[in-house]
A protein has these predicted regions:
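Conserved alpha-helical scaffold segments that buttress catalytic/binding sites
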Residues: 1-186
């Protein structure tokens, strides 16, 4: 687990930077179950042996410098991956997706599964290439990302027709919220 307390890309309501702290505070109530958690429905124990969850703290964010903050994020994710661990990143706004995905370039043919109301495929919203409205477009530009599946898309006004056309031309699978409601999740 690593926190990325960054929300400078947020255009409306800030506060996502407090996400890592909030999750840690809430999870501290359940920190006593070192042997894992038993699920009576599945009749299985989760997050017990051999799993080990490590809190790596927060990425160093310089709240006036997006580039350096994103470099710090990318470096932290690369370090976690180099230890053969799976990073679970707590944000932060959608803009943090880009440096996180960039760090995964040690793998080939990755598929990104994106749950969101918005397409996040804008070219450079408000002149910002690595903002919260464009991480899926940035992902499509990365050689190690071979597929993007977007689930729950419904946000009218968050993307233009050309953004949807570009996403479809890239090969994204777009499943709208209406399709999810109609077809269910199984």
């Amino acid at each position: 687990v690593i926190g990325m307390p960054y929300d400078l890309g947020t255009s409306v309501n800030t506060g996502a930077r407090f996400g890592p702290r909030g999750v840690r505070e809430a999870s501290s109530y359940n920190c006593y179950a070192h042997e894992g958690w038993y699920d009576p429905i599945r009749k299985e124990t989760f997050l017990g042996e051999p799993w080990k969850i490590v809190d790596c703290g927060n990425v160093d964010v310089l709240h006036t410098e997006q580039t350096r903050s994103f470099q710090n994020c990318e470096a932290a994710i690369r370090k976690i991956l180099s230890k053969k661990a799976i990073p679970f990143v707590i944000g932060g706004d959608h803009a943090i997706t880009t440096p996180i995905l960039r760090a995964f370039d040690c793998f080939d043919n990755l598929c990104v599964i994106h749950f969101d109301a918005h397409l996040d495929f804008s070219k450079n919203p408000h002149g910002i290439a690595e903002g919260p409205g464009s991480p899926m477009r940035r992902a499509s530009e990365m050689a190690h990302i071979s597929k993007i599946v977007q689930i729950g898309i419904r946000g009218i006004g968050s993307s233009q027709l050309s953004d949807f056309q570009d996403a479809e031309a890239y090969g994204n699978t777009i499943i709208t919220s209406r399709e999810v409601r109609r077809n269910g999740v199984e």
